């Protein structure tokens, strides 16, 4: 991308290079979103459009970044690397909030499998780290510069030294944090992830059967302080308010030492929320959080008044779009504190 944009003549050509690079980049790592369109026949014709149009749209951001770089008449020098890095990192930051935001697949995500390198993010934040990552990935372009061989080797050596120092720093942080893992928290967290066929969600299965399946899988021990985490949306055909009809199942199987975290839909008047609740052994609500960031087309239909006239709806079950809340408070249950995030929201954290 750097070399092509550096050699290209014309700002429109630079835009197209960035656009096509962005299209290729996003289609290679967003193809999986089409899986969500396979569960209902009405959505299957949209698969080719989702596969092509979403990466094509997101690629425009990279096109704009390269277009902006062309205004500087870049030469083969280190300042050109900085300009391109700043341009790409700024456009990725803009992408995080414009049109509702989609801060996904940043170039910095390349480090995801290498935790040692990621520890510095606690100081830099995601987007400054993204800038550093782009600069580092562009450093090898120095070999094409008209620099002396010693200058090239020195630049590459400095880059590797910085990378090594960061790796060692990360290793130290991870080693120190292992002490936290060894702390006796006096409770157990059990994540219940049943292999429930997707068809069960669309066949209006009796919620009692699903709850009993979850209870059986959780294997509650009356003497052990435990937090059970049930899946988001596992009770797809009832609302939170209906859960009281099944409270006897919870009372018969759980004790005062148990808490249950559950993802379930809730409604207030004409509004529907994707909620996370903390329940006690009698299914009483101890805390509740309503999702702030909803998945476009997945949980709500943009321009719903218009698009619904064409028979379109959100991808998830039901026709009415979810509503977004604007509050996210730390949940504190018996001095166990956590900040709730549901699914898609993690990319905004």
Segments from the language model and where they lie:
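Membrane-embedded alpha-helical bundles of multi-pass enzymes
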Residues: 1-177
């Amino acid at each position: 991308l750097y070399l092509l944009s550096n050699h290209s003549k014309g700002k429109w050509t630079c835009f197209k290079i960035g656009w096509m690079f962005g299209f290729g980049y996003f289609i290679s790592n967003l193809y999986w979103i089409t899986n969500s369109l396979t569960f209902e026949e009405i959505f299957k014709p949209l698969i080719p459009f989702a596969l092509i149009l979403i990466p094509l749209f997101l690629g425009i951001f990279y096109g704009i970044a390269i277009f902006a770089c062309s205004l500087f008449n870049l030469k083969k020098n280190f300042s050109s690397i900085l300009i391109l890095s700043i341009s790409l990192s700024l456009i990725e930051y803009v992408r995080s909030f414009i049109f509702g935001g989609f801060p996904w697949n940043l170039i910095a995500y390349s480090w995801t499998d290498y935790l040692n390198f990621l520890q510095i993010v606690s100081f830099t934040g995601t987007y400054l780290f993204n800038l550093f990552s782009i600069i580092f990935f562009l450093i090898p372009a120095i070999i094409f510069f008209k620099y002396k061989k010693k200058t090239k080797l020195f630049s590459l050596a400095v880059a590797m030294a910085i990378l090594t120092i960061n790796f060692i720093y990360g290793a130290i942080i991870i080693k120190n944090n292992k002490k936290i893992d060894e702390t006796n928290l006096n409770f157990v967290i059990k994540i219940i992830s049943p292999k429930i066929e997707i068809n069960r969600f669309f066949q209006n299965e009796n919620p009692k059967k699903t709850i009993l399946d979850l209870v059986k899988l959780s294997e509650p021990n009356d003497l052990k302080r435990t937090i059970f985490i049930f899946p988001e949306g596992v009770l797809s055909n009832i609302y939170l308010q209906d859960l009281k009809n099944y409270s006897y199942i919870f009372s018969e199987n759980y004790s005062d030492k148990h808490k249950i975290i559950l993802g379930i839909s809730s409604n207030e008047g004409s509004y529907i929320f994707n909620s996370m609740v903390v329940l006690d052994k009698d299914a009483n609500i101890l805390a509740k959080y309503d999702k702030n960031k909803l998945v476009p087309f997945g949980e709500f239909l943009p321009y719903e008044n218009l698009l619904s006239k064409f028979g379109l709806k959100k991808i998830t079950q039901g026709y009415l779009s979810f509503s977004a809340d604007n509050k996210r408070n730390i949940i504190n249950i018996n001095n166990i504190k956590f900040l709730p995030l549901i699914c898609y929201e993690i990319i905004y954290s």
